[in-house]
Amino acid sequence: MGKHILLLPLGLSLLMSSLLALQCFRCTSFDSTGFCHVGRQKCQTYPDEICAWVVVTTRDGKFVYGNQSCAECNATTVEHGSLIVSTNCCSATPFCNMVHR
């Protein structure tokens, strides 16, 4: 009986973590239209993660690369040589990292 009592908190913990987890899109490489060419999947966030997507463009606005994931995320825009790398984060709704271009 003692084992059954110990399983209850574990079960509740797993239930709560699954309820708090956020579903996001995962894509290793998407194009300028947002179409995923490599690794189209869904992911579920772990604690401290949210939905994220990264877009790399040239200084004159030409699309170079994009990806989506579940990740620890800080929204930033960084210039690196002739490229601009924009990291975007969201957690408001499931699959909020859908890319519309």
Swiss-Prot record:
Pfam families: UPAR_LY6 (PF00021). CDD domains: TFP_LU_ECD_UP. Transmembrane segments: none annotated. The keyword Calcium does not apply. Disulfide bonds join C24-C51, C27-C36, C43-C70, C73-C89, C90-C96. One of its GO terms (molecular function) is complement binding. GO terms for cellular component: extracellular region; plasma membrane. N-glycosylated. Its main location: secreted. It is found in: Secreted. Residues 22-99 form the UPAR/Ly6 domain. This is Urinary protein 2. It comes from Rattus norvegicus.
